[in-house]
Each structure stands twice: as structure tokens, then as C-alpha cells.
UniProtKB/Swiss-Prot annotation:
One of its GO terms (molecular function) is GTP binding. NCBIfam families: EF-G, PRK12740.1-5, small_GTP. The keyword Repeat does not apply. This is Elongation factor G. The gene is fusA.
Length: 699
């Protein structure tokens, strides 16, 4: 099948934002204007096309990032047709993992900001994630029609809070109730959309005289910013020569793709104004798959570095970025094709698991509608049905030209709850349901508690686990009773020690003998566990090093003080001895475990707890009560700011003290304060609190 759209006219973009910035409404308008959906879906009516899970329509928030393909010929309908693949990403902090995995496979993003709320805590998180993956972006300041809308303030916040380099390419005509359209600073024209036709038609007119001076100043700023990023434009600018719109747009495109500049647009998605021009900006300023550097990976056979270009003639390579269970076709694996072509019915390699996979059917998704296609090409985003071994973050590639793309990193869960099915008959169904949900979501874990036999589920926050339990009921028909949330404590050591682990057992016949000397050292927070072999002269043979490490790992899992996993520790085996007959892998595994436990007990072991960054926005009159309450929760104040007629309080609070905070903050402020919280770091638990936790764990 020949390509209908050249790859240069592809745009793989994400829409990223804070929870109430109007991101899903913006996506709905994009789908409407590009002709995919004929009736606009409204979030507040629960009909939005992208929010296709029942819980999303009830809660009005986007949980899973649905992938959608649409086509655009420009606002005036005169351009060559471009293909835009959009990933809608959730804005709630418990779902940052969804955002992270979407950004990994995108080429560009549209960051949506609320003209009233501006840069919110979640905007900062998502922006940092986009920086990590070097995703070029444009900004769309939405909700310009709302009370309190202020375009300039949001632009300033993008510069100060996000440390971006925002360059407005539009100005709003009016704000709040008076918002009627935008000024295009490239053409120096005002654009007005026809309300009666839901914004599908527009007129270009002269700039209103009252705004002419502002527009000229803003254009001057825009041209200077572009000149700063582009030598050719700078030369013309300094010489006082005329710079054409085409030259300015080409230079701004280059600066956006390099990450030097963020073009800023504005509008009101709800009022059908501005999204059409933002789509033009996606074409003008965001990269196609060939504008960004080719994808890099390694040869799984020899570790050599390999590069794959975004070209149909290259060997096939793709990254699975999401697993979803569809009620009609079963398991769907969403993947982004970086190079080559994949045909339905062909077999590919999953190098990370060394498994071959047959691709049954390939589907292109429009929210939760599916269209079966015969093949996917470089730059495409699609979903495959029936893959057995692929998990989120796995590479899929050509059998004969293998490549392993860089793995995705997923955060460790910070909160646990015990779940039990309401009826014994549901026990097995619950196991299957949780297994499927864990395969879809790498930040969600399931395990069985060895002592109590309870099923423990872990995730990134209370809402995350609530939605998992809700999905079990809706999608798998399993009702569960949920225990009180438990904090995921960790343990670590504070000083370097050396310790001996010796396991000798003699009871007639062959004995057991394992003997090791270990050095335990504390590591920087977030380093995890490192094991090194420092044995010289063969005092411990090579075949017993691995079992020793396994023994240490088992001891790590069971903790030192209160049974919580030990982190940020380096263990080096540097000496020991063995017996020709009696030594075995099992004996060295036990010796490793004994050596670690003995050493850790002497190495100043401490408890660590997850600390959350909390931001509360409250009317000033409730500030004293809210700060007092934060202090009573062992909170540490980080600062305060004025925020649109209210106060923004920034603090860090242990997760253990935050359960039920939503109710408290509502009652303290008569429902007028709002808060967000997200995991920040692990810190040592104060002595008196640690004692209580240890006592509780020993019961």
C-alpha cells in the first residue's frame, strides 16, 4: 500500500495540561474541526469522545490516554493535507505515568493552560516530563472567555514557573466576557470565528485601532525572539531589512523544534475560538518524524549502538507504549512505529523478552472506535490485537534486524491497600482482573502478603487505587472490600560496615558450607541496590557469587527494623571461604542473607517515608487554620504566593499524615480551598514516629 500522506506531513502530538485547563474539550474541538466527529462532545455532558471509560465520563477527568488520528488542511482549507496523531493525556497527578509514557512516543506537544488558573502544580510536573524527553511544544492559553482570564499573566508564569521561553504569536481581542477573537502577529490581522457555524468559518480583518499599539509592540517582541534564535533572521533584523512571514515562520519552526522557544496562542475551546488557529500552529511549528533525530537503540546480540531513521525502507522498529483491555477485541497493544513497515499477519521480535510475536490484526484508533488496517508505516501510531508477551515500554522489531530501544522508567508505588473479594467465588476472577490491570499500568503492582495471605495492591495515590477497584467492578464484575491505605515505608543504612555471613551444617552425610564477608555502604537517595564482586584470588568461586547476591536481595526485601524493603545500599562481597564437597548455591544464598542481616543491624538502620509536595490554594481568611493544620501533620512550609485573589501555600508533608486531608481542607475552608499533592522524595522518619511504626510492625 502506497503512502497517502508523506511522512513530512505527519504530526505525532500530545495534549498536556493541568486537570481543569480544558484539555479534553480542546481535543474534542480538534476532532470536530478536522471532521472526525460530527457533533461536538462536551465534558460536562459526559459525552466527550476521548474520555471513553465509564469512570472518566462520570468524574469528568481523563484517565487513559486514547490515541486518535485526524487530518487537517489548514484553517482556510488550502494547505496540503496533514495527518495528525493525537494522544490525549490525563492531567491528574495520580496518572503522571500515563503522561510519561505518552510523551516518550510523541514528536511534539500542545500544552494547554487555563487563562484564569495559569501554571498549576501539575502543569509543572508535565512540563518537567516533556523536558526530560526533549519534546518541542507550543502553548495554548484556553478559557480566555472566563472571569479572571489574563493572557499576559499566564505568559509570564510560563517564563518564571516553568523556565520556558514563551513567545506569543497571537494576542487576545478582549478578555473575559469581551473575548471575541485573536490577533495574528505574523500577518498583523484580527481573526474572528463565526459563532452561528460553531467556528467552522472565520474572517480576517484589520486590527481594531485600540489594540494596534499593543499588537505592534508584541510583534516587535516576537521578531526579536525569533532573531535571537536564528542567525539569518538576526542579520536581516540588524540591517533593517524586511523579513517575510515565510522566513519568520521557518525560523520559528526551527527554534521551536530545538526547544529554544515556545510559541504561545490563545482562545476558548468551549466558545469555538482559537483551536482552529492552534491546529495551524501544530502544522507550522511542531516537528514531523523526520525533523527530530533518528531513534537510537542497541543490538540485543552484542550491545552495539544502532540508529533507525524514520523511513519506510528501514528495518521495522516500534515501541509499545500502552496496553489496554478492550471489551470487544480483548487486549490492545498501542505502539509507535519509528522505522519500516509492519503488515498485519507478520511476525516480529520482542528483544527484551526474547520472544517472537505474531501480529494478528492492526487497528487505527479514533478514541474507542477502531478501524482495521492492513499495514502501518514509519511515523504511525496504531494498536495490535492479541500480543502475548509485550508489556508497556517493550520494543517490537524486525526478526532479522533486531534493535532494543531505550526502556521506559516507571516510578515505585507509594501507597498500598489490602483488597478482598466480597464473595469467595470471586477470588479467582479478582486475581485475573488485577493481573490484567497491572499489565496495562506499570505503576500499579499486585502481590500476596506472605503472612496474612491478603492481596495487596499498590499505586501512586488514593485516586489511582480507587479507580483500579472501580474498574475491577465495572469491567470484570468483581466487587472488592478495600482496607485502610498503608504507606510504602522503606529502610536504609547510614554508615559503612563489614560483616561476616557463615552457614555451616553437619548432620551425617553431605554437609552445607557457605562463608562470605560483605561490605555494606549507604548510597545517595534513589540509587536503589548495587551488588559488586570484589573477591580476589578465588576465595569464593564465581559460581557462588550469584547465589550470594540472591540471598542479599531476599534479606533486602524483608527489611532490618520493621520488615520494609531496604533501598539505597551497595553491598560488596570481598572475601570468604568454601568447601570442595559441602559448599552449594543454597548454602551461599543463606550465608549472603545472614551476612547482610548481621551487617545492616550494625549500620545505623533507619526508616524512610514518602514525602509529598502539597500545594493549597485558599482564600486569605482561612490561611491561618490551614497552616496550623499542616504543621500538625508534620508539614514543612516551603513558601507562599499570591494567586488570583487567594493565597498559594507550598509545603512538604509525609504521606502518612495526608489520609483524609480532602475532608479536612473542605471543612476548614467551607469548601473554598483546593489542594494538589504529588510524590516528592523519601526522607528519614523522626525517632518518636519511627518507634510507633516499628512497634506496630512487630505485633
Amino acid at each position: 500500500m502506497a503512502r497517502t500522506t508523506p511522512i513530512e506531513r505527519y504530526r505525532n502530538i500530545g495534549i498536556m495540561a493541568h486537570i481543569d485547563a480544558g484539555k479534553t474539550t480542546t481535543t474534542e474541538r480538534i476532532l470536530f474541526y478536522t471532521g472526525v466527529s460530527h457533533k461536538i462532545g462536551e465534558v460536562h455532558e459526559g459525552t466527550a469522545v476521548m474520555d471513553w471509560m465509564a469512570q472518566e465520563q462520570e468524574r469528568g477527568i481523563t484517565i487513559t490516554s486514547a490515541a486518535t488520528t485526524c487530518f487537517w488542511k489548514g484553517m482556510d482549507g488550502q494547505r496540503a493535507e496533514h495527518r495528525i496523531n493525537i494522544i490525549d493525556t490525563p492531567g491528574h497527578v495520580d496518572f503522571t505515568i500515563e503522561v510519561e509514557r505518552s510523551l516518550r512516543v510523541l514528536d511534539g506537544a500542545m500544552a494547554v493552560f487555563c487563562a484564569v488558573g495559569g501554571v498549576q502544580p501539575q502543569s509543572e510536573t508535565v512540563w518537567r516530563q516533556a523536558n526530560k524527553y526533549k519534546v518541542p511544544r507550543i502553548a495554548f492559553v484556553n478559557k480566555m472567555d472566563r472571569q479572571g482570564a489574563n493572557f499576559k499573566r499566564v505568559v509570564d508564569q510560563i517564563a518564571t514557573k516553568l523556565r520556558g521561553n514563551p513567545v506569543p504569536v497571537q494576542l487576545p481581542i478582549g478578555e473575559e466576557d469581551h473575548f471575541s477573537g485573536v490577533i495574528d502577529l505574523m500577518k498583523m490581522k484580527s481573526i474572528n470565528w463565526d459563532d452561528a457555524l460553531q467556528g467552522t468559518r472565520f474572517t480576517e480583518e484589520d486590527i481594531p485601532p485600540a489594540l494596534q499599539a499593543d499588537a505592534e509592540a508584541a510583534r516587535h517582541f516576537m521578531v526579536e525572539a525569533i532573531a535571537d534564535a536564528d542567525e539569518d533572521v538576526m542579520m536581516k533584523y540588524l540591517e533593517g531589512e524586511e523579513i517575510s512571514i515565510a522566513e519568520l515562520q521557518a525560523a520559528l519552526r526551527k527554534a521551536t523544534i530545538s526547544g529554544a522557544v515556545v510559541p504561545v496562542l490563545c482562545g476558548s475551546a468551549f466558545k469555538n475560538k482559537g483551536v482552529q488557529a492552534a491546529l495551524d500552529a501544530v502544522l507550522d511549528y511542531l516537528p514531523s518524524p523526520v525533523d527530530i533525530k533518528p531513534v537510537e537503540g542497541t543490538n540485543p546480540d552484542n550491545g552495539e549502538e544502532i540508529v533507525r531513521f524514520a523511513d519506510d525502507s528501514e528495518p521495522f522498529s516500534a515501541l509499545a507504549f500502552k496496553i489496554a483491555t478492550d471489551p470487544f477485541v480483548g487486549q490492545l497493544t498501542f505502539f509507535r512505529v519509528y522505522s519500516g513497515v509492519l503488515t498485519a499477519g507478520s511476525t516480529v521480535l520482542n528483544p527484551g523478552r526474547n520472544q517472537k510475536e505474531r501480529i494478528g490484526r492492526v487497528l487505527q484508533m479514533h478514541a474507542n472506535e477502531r478501524h482495521e488496517i492492513k499495514e502501518v508505516l514509519a511515523g504511525d501510531i496504531a494498536a495490535a490485537v492479541g500480543l502475548k508477551t509485550a508489556y508497556t515500554g517493550d520494543t517490537l522489531c524486525d526478526l532479522n534486524k533486531p534493535i532494543a530501544l531505550e526502556q521506559m522508567e516507571f516510578p515505585e508505588p507509594v501507597i498500598h491497600v489490602a483488597v478482598e473479594p466480597k464473595t469467595k467465588a470471586d477470588q479467582e476472577k479478582m486475581g485475573i482482573a488485577l493481573g490484567k490491570l497491572a499489565q496495562e499500568d506499570p505503576s500499579f503492582r499486585v502481590r500476596t502478603d506472605q503472612e496474612s495471605g491478603q492481596t495487596i495492591i499498590s499505586g501512586m495515590g488514593e485516586l489511582h487505587l480507587e479507580i483500579i477497584v472501580d474498574r475491577m467492578k465495572r469491567e470484570f464484575g468483581v466487587e472488592a472490600t478495600v482496607g485502610a491505605p498503608q504507606v510504602a515505608y522503606r529502610e536504609t543504612i547510614r554508615k559503612t560496615v563489614e560483616s561476616e555471613g557463615k552457614f555451616v551444617r553437619q548432620s551425617g552425610g553431605r554437609g552445607q558450607y557457605g562463608h562470605v564477608w560483605l561490605r555494606l555502604e549507604p548510597l545517595e537517595p534513589g540509587s536503589g541496590f548495587v551488588f559488586e564482586n570484589g573477591v580476589v584470588g578465588g576465595t569464593v568461586p564465581k559460581e557462588f557469587i550469584n547465589p550470594t547476591e540472591k540471598g542479599v536481595e531476599e534479606a533486602l526485601e524483608n527489611g532490618i527494623i520493621a520488615g520494609f524493603p531496604v533501598v539505597d545500599v551497595k553491598v560488596t562481597i570481598f572475601d570468604g571461604s568454601y568447601h570442595d564437597v559441602d559448599s552449594s548455591e543454597a548454602a551461599f544464598k543463606i550465608a549472603g542473607s545472614m551476612g547482610f542481616k548481621a551487617g545492616a543491624a550494625k549500620a545505623n538502620p533507619v526508616l524512610l517515608e514518602p514525602i509529598f509536595a502539597v500545594e493549597v490554594v485558599t482564600p486569605e481568611e482561612y490561611m491561618g487554620d490551614i497552616i496550623g493544620d499542616i504543621n500538625s501533620r508534620r508539614g514543612m512550609m516551603q513558601g507562599m504566593e499570591d494567586e488570583a485573589g487567594a493565597k498559594l501555600i507550598r509545603c512538604e508533608v509525609p504521606l502518612a499524615e495526608m489520609f483524609g486531608y480532602a475532608t479536612t481542607v473542605r471543612s476548614l475552608s467551607q469548601g473554598r480551598a483546593t489542594y494538589t499533592m504529588q510524590f516528592e522524595k523519601y526522607m528519614e522518619v523522626p525517632g518518636h514516629v519511627a518507634e510507633a511504626i516499628v512497634k506496630k510492625s512487630q505485633r
